[in-house]
Amino acid sequence: MTKIAEKSKQEYGDLLKEKDHLQDMEQLEMTIVSIQTPYPSIVRIQGKINTLQPELWQAPNLAIRLIVSNPPEGQPISRVYTVRSFNPINAQIEIDFVKHEDLSPAMEWLNSAQVGTKIGLIGPRPHFIPNFTAKKHVVMFADDTAVPALYSILKQWELGISADIFIESFEKDIASQLPELEHVKIHSFHKEHHTSQKGLLLKAAFALEHYENITIWAACERNEARALRQFFLEDQQLNKNDVRIAGYWRDGVSSSELDKLRAQHYQEHIQQGKTLNEYDDLDLAN
């Protein structure tokens, strides 16, 4: 590893420890109590956490950082995942992993995980939910990586709010385990494995019947997320508070490399005197 790479890795680890980044998050240990495969491409892990603040874990769309590797030299390697659910009675959380063929640090850990395995984590960090305050029709876009976020949001859905939810997935019945709610319609787009087909969510956005009195929530691949944001903010001129979009991963870029780019961008952000609450990950040019 070059000195530049070492410096970048060290700076990233330091950034994760800063007060602005940690805020009210806990640094905990999770013990796996169950491993299931609800779909061929998804592994669901249930783990018990030793939280002293269970109230922090009951909000929808919470993100955590799992310490998937602790190399003898250098910084721990971590990955961000969404908490699908939290049970306050037994302090257990559910996390879904989308399986990949490459042996990334996360997949190596997942392949070795078994009941009783312990892993460190940092969290939870609340991520955005749809803008329910104006009582507008909600339109949501998600790929496989965002289905746990969808699940947690639907479990705490605002009464009386209508929605159309578009899901792009490798699994034909991905919506079968999502809560069924009145006035909420789910549209699933099945994507074959190893296909080069892209942009299904963006095409769905282009095909909406109207763009008045709607509010947007989306989480998917970064390039598509950025295109969705541009379409709704610039082309349709929706209010920024009604366009809540996140890019969870980037096609062709490893999570390690993406984390480095995010760290550099976040460092520039805080050097300008800004805070985490003002940070928009999709402003990252790469």
Swiss-Prot record:
Domain annotation FAD-binding FR-type: ranges: 25-131
Gene Ontology MF annotations: nucleotide binding; oxidoreductase activity
UniProt-listed CDD domains: siderophore_interacting
InterPro entries: FAD-bd_9_SIP, FAD-bd_FR_type, FNR_nucleotide-bd, SIP_C, SIP_fam
Reactions listed under catalytic activity: 2 a Fe(II)-siderophore + NAD(+) + H(+) = 2 a Fe(III)-siderophore + NADH; 2 a Fe(II)-siderophore + NADP(+) + H(+) = 2 a Fe(III)-siderophore + NADPH
Cofactor(s) annotated in UniProt: FAD
Top-level taxon of the source organism: Bacteria
Key words, A-Z: FAD, Flavoprotein, NAD, NADP, Nucleotide-binding, Oxidoreductase
Family that this chain belongs to: Belongs to the SIP oxidoreductase family.
Function: Ferric-siderophore reductase involved in iron removal from the siderophores after their transport into the cell. Interacts with the siderophores acinetobactin (Acb) and preacinetobactin (pre-Acb) and catalyzes the reduction of the ferric iron bound to the siderophores to ferrous iron, resulting in destabilization of the siderophore chelation complex and entrance of ferrous iron into the intracellular pool of bioavailable metals. Can use NADH and NADPH as electron donors in vitro, but the reduction rate is very slow, suggesting that NADH and NADPH are not the physiological partners of BauF.
This protein's name: Ferric acinetobactin reductase
Annotated organism of origin: Acinetobacter baumannii
Gene: bauF
